Each structure stands twice: as C-alpha cells, then as structure tokens.
C-alpha cells in the first residue's frame, strides 16, 4: 500500500529539519516539508523539555541544565537554523549590495559570531528566569519559531531562485493557505485543551494560554522585517527567523509569566 503524500512529506520534514533517524519503510518526499516544520519543532522542543526535567530531577544546577538544553536543541536541528542566523547577520552587516555575497561566504564574520553569542545568552537568561515553567516554554518557542518561515515563504520572493542547493523549492511547491494547516491544527488543539485544563486546575494552564498568543506577533514581525531589509528571503533568513522568534518568544514568556 502506497503511503499518502502528506505522510511522505512529514517523513521528509523529519530528516530535513533534524538529525533524528529516518522512518523505516517510508520513502520521504521533500517538496512540501515546510508545512510540517512546526510539528518537528514540537518534537525537538519536547526532547529539550524532557532533558530539562530529567536533569532537574537529578539535582543538576539550573544554569548547567539551561546550557545543556540549548546545546541539545542546536544538535537536534543539525545547526541548520543557527548557521542561517550567523549568515544572515553577516549579510545584514555587509549592506544590501554585498548582502548575498556575504551570506554565501563560508567564513563566519564578526557579526555572525556576535549574533550567535547574543542569542545563546538571551535564551539562557530566559530559561533561568522561567525556572519550572521552562519545559512548556521550550515547546511553545520551538513551535512558533518554525511557524515564522511559513509567513516568509508566503510573503516574499526567494533571493536565490534557481541556485543549486537552495531552499527555493519551499516556495515553488507551496499551495497557499494549506501550508499553514498543520500549524493551525496544533493551535486548535491547544485552544480545545485550555478550557479542560482550567476545569481540572492544571497549574501550568496560564503558560499554555500565554504561549498561544505570545508567539504570534514575533512569528509574523521577524520574517516581515527581515524580508523588507533583505529585499526577500533565502534559506539562511528562514533559519534566522526560526532562531530569533524562538528567542523572543522565550523572553516574552519569561517577562509575562514571572512578572510581579
């Protein structure tokens, strides 16, 4: 029996966006994998959350746990998005005329290193502030981070159209609003679960409620601002959008949920 195309796309997203082993017996397809990136984000965020809970239960210091969790996230994604962040930072620093040339350069510039350092420090600070709320916040941030490129793909031209090895296939095969359907299903499930959690008095219900709304604005604004600045998007800026939205979402959750 032939597997449905959506399942093959999901299998393709699984191995494209992570270093997790491929699914046995299922031939992956890559044309429309971007729509499933938010689902992969939930898986990776879930693994980070699991590591956090295990190490905290083992009485590891929170600062060490935060570092290891961030390191795990970088490894699970194969450094794909962090590489895009550094290349995009170098491109922005080079100016519009030399932007793509700087982003294509295999050498990392000072701006790329600074961007990576700042992002990691901000994520550590947010996780330390969140404390016991960090596991759920990691899930929320990973989801919204992977939603950001969907807006970039829908809204902006691809800067390296036709270039070998580019991520232009994301735009080439996208089918309008259907690309956002998997992400909408997650949000619908969350909106359905929240009232049930309120009934049973689950202590982290406020985190979930805040997370549904907190990530929306950065998931649209970050790719929008990057696209306007760069004159379009590329695979690098897709990755940068993921990392920046993750970081901003963690910070917003840290501020909102620990205020007072």
UniProtKB/Swiss-Prot annotation:
GO terms for cellular component: plasma membrane. Keywords: Cell inner membrane, Cell membrane, Cobalamin biosynthesis, Magnesium, Membrane, Transferase, Transmembrane, Transmembrane helix. InterPro entries: CobS (IPR003805). It catalyses: alpha-ribazole + adenosylcob(III)inamide-GDP = adenosylcob(III)alamin + GMP + H(+); alpha-ribazole 5'-phosphate + adenosylcob(III)inamide-GDP = adenosylcob(III)alamin 5'-phosphate + GMP + H(+). It holds the Pfam family CobS. It is a multi-pass membrane protein. GO terms for biological process: cobalamin biosynthetic process. Its cofactor is Mg(2+). The chain crosses the membrane at residues 3-23, 36-56, 60-80, 108-128, 133-153, 180-200, 206-226, 239-259. It is found in: Cell inner membrane. HAMAP family: CobS. Joins adenosylcobinamide-GDP and alpha-ribazole to generate adenosylcobalamin (Ado-cobalamin). Also synthesizes adenosylcobalamin 5'-phosphate from adenosylcobinamide-GDP and alpha-ribazole 5'-phosphate. NCBIfam families: cobS. This is Adenosylcobinamide-GDP ribazoletransferase. The lineage of its organism: Bacteria, Bacillati, Cyanobacteriota, Cyanophyceae, Synechococcales.
């Amino acid at each position: 029996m032939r597997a449905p195309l959506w399942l093959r796309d999901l299998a393709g997203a699984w191995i494209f966006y992570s270093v997790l082993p491929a699914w046995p017996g299922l031939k992956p397809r890559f044309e429309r994998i971007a729509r499933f990136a938010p689902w992969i984000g939930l898986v990776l965020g879930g693994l980070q959350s699991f590591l956090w809970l295990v190490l905290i239960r083992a009485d590891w210091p929170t600062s060490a746990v935060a570092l290891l969790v961030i390191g795990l996230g970088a490894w699970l994604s194969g450094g794909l998005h962090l590489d895009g962040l550094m290349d995009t930072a170098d491109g922005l620093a080079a100016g519009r005329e030399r932007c793509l040339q700087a982003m294509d350069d295999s050498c990392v510039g000072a701006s790329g290193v600074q961007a990576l350092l700042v992002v990691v420090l901000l994520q550590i600070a947010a996780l330390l502030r969140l404390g016991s709320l960090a596991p759920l916040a990691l899930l929320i941030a990973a989801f919204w981070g992977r939603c950001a490129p969907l807006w970039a793909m829908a809204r902006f031209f691809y800067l390296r159209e036709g270039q070998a090895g580019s991520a232009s296939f994301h735009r080439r095969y996208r089918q309008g609003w259907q690309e956002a359907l998997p992400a909408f299903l997650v949000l619908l499930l969350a909106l359905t679960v929240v009232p049930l959690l309120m009934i049973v008095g689950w202590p982290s219900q406020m985190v979930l409620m805040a997370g549904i709304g907190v990530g929306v604005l950065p998931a649209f604004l970050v790719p929008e601002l990057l696209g306007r600045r760069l004159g379009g998007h590329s695979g690098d800026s897709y990755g940068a959008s993921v990392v920046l939205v993750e970081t901003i979402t963690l910070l917003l959750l840290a501020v909102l949920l620990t205020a007072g």
